[in-house]
Amino acid sequence: AYGEGANVFGKRKETDQFFEISGDGWSGKL
């Protein structure tokens, strides 16, 4: 996801899914 940061804005769905996974991971650690 970070590697495709330039296209992240053009792929909102993929970004949302990525953030959901990342959010869950961070929530688990927090």
From Swiss-Prot:
Subcellular location(s) per record: Plastid, Chloroplast thylakoid membrane
GO cellular component annotations of the record: chloroplast; chloroplast thylakoid membrane; photosystem II
Keyword Thylakoid tagged: yes
Sorted UniProt keywords: Chloroplast, Membrane, Photosynthesis, Photosystem II, Plastid, Thylakoid
One GO term (biological process): photosynthesis
Function: May be involved in the regulation of photosystem II.
Family: Belongs to the PsbP family.
Protein name stated in the entry: Oxygen-evolving enhancer protein 2
